[in-house]
Curated annotation (Swiss-Prot):
It is found in: Cytoplasm. The active site is at 62. It catalyses: [protein]-L-isoaspartate + S-adenosyl-L-methionine = [protein]-L-isoaspartate alpha-methyl ester + S-adenosyl-L-homocysteine. The gene is pcm. This is Protein-L-isoaspartate O-methyltransferase. Keywords: Cytoplasm, Methyltransferase, S-adenosyl-L-methionine, Transferase. Catalyzes the methyl esterification of L-isoaspartyl residues in peptides and proteins that result from spontaneous decomposition of normal L-aspartyl and L-asparaginyl residues. It plays a role in the repair and/or degradation of damaged proteins. PROSITE patterns: PCMT.
Amino acid sequence: MNQTGSTVAINLAKKLYDAGIRDNLVLQAIANTPREMFLDAALAHKAYENTALPIGQGQTISQPYIVARMTELVMQNRPQRVLEVGTGSGYQAAILAKLVPELCTIERIKALQIQARQRLKRLDLHNVSFKYGDGWLGWPNRGPFDAIMVTAAAASLPTALLEQLSEGGRLIIPVGEDAQQLLAITRKGQEYSSEVIESVKFVPLVNGNLA
């Protein structure tokens, strides 16, 4: 594993390896990304705990294991163009931007989008396109996408996102309300195969924009 990250970030990546994450590129990206940059100063001391944390606006930064697991699932086919639905703090986007040539990310809460854009700029990540909008609708004029990652739980599968997958593309999405499951959905022509990965708990994927 690349050892250029901070000691605490490297230790987190080692813990994720012990938890079953095996993609070395994903682990390196986590080891080299300062998670504290994506949190309020009052929570910075918790940055490398394997737990979800609040980021304001009723949203959270996902626990590092889930970030790593979803990224690993996205990266199985080494995608060229990826869509992230739910930019949030920007942490997941930062991890993805280090791994794929082109990342598009959508956020419905303007304040979060502005903060995330500033953070990724400070990290010198310039292969990311940001959109303020409704994630349920995707980003049709930038697709199709080799992979789509949704970082909030949908009550049902968003049809627009399925349609924006390229042939062989994968949608990684938590689905459900009280009982949620992380699904990996692969497009084959006009058909889609679905695999249940594990049980998860995410904030809900909400329709529409929030200023």
